[in-house]
């Protein structure tokens, strides 16, 4: 949320840094002004996905000496790290801010777009992804980071999101 208005300032000459990743910290926290039970695994995955979309520095806030397998799985996601480290260096911009979800779009150096659909609600949600919801979006080729496979998308994709889930897609054909 804090990075949303800063996209024009982020890039190869300077990176917007919203602080450290909370993936794997676990346990109770008072950092939000009241005691909470911490994040679920799905929330950690969403946090990391959005962080990567922002091209933010990947600084771990957890104890890296004692990471469990699920934390490692999140933090070592090659596809998300590739989006974060894309040489174009652009930060994602919020394309849609609806009542309970966001759509973020990050241009990539090869001409494709990384698109993140994030459910901010504590209830499941289905959103439609197409050229009306994201300007100039090509669905000619769509790679889902969630399923690690190509999606069949004629004119749209119906994105089913669990509470607080973020799904990321790479859309379009790479430019040669």
Residue ranges and their predicted role:
Residues 1-62:
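Glycan-recognition surfaces
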Residues 28, 58, 65, 88, ...:
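Short, glycine-/Ser/Thr-/acidic-enriched flexible segments
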Residues 29-30, 60-61, 67-70, 122-125, ...:
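Flexible loop/turn segments at secondary-structure boundaries
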Residues 37-40, 101-105, 156-157:
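Generic recognition of flexible, low-complexity loop/linker segments
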Residues 46-95:
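Catalytic cores of secreted or luminal carbohydrate-active enzymes
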Residues 51-54, 59-61, 97-134, 164:
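Carbohydrate-binding surface patches
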Residues 132-147:
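Solvent-exposed beta-hairpin/edge-strand motifs
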Residues 152-176:
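C-terminal beta-strand-rich structural cap/linker in extracellular carbohydrate-active enzymes
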């Amino acid at each position: 949320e804090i990075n949303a208005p800063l996209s024009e300032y982020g890039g190869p000459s300077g990176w917007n840094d919203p602080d450290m990743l909370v993936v794997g910290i676990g346990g109770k926290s008072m950092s939000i002004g009241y005691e909470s039970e911490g994040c679920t695994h799905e929330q950690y995955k969403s946090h990391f996905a959005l962080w990567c979309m922002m091209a933010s520095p990947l600084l771990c806030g957890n104890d890296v000496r004692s990471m469990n397998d699920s934390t490692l799985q999140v933090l070592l996601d090659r596809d998300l790290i590739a989006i974060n480290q894309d040489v174009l260096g652009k930060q994602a911009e919020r394309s849609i801010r609806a009542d309970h979800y966001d759509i973020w779009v990050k241009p990539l150096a090869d001409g494709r777009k990384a698109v993140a659909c994030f459910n901010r609600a504590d209830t499941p949600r289905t959103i439609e992804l197409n050229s009306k919801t994201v300007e100039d979006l090509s669905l000619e080729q769509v790679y889902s980071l969630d399923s690690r496979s190509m999606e069949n998308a004629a004119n749209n994709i119906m994105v089913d999101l669990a509470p607080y889930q973020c799904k990321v897609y790479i859309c379009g054909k790479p430019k040669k």
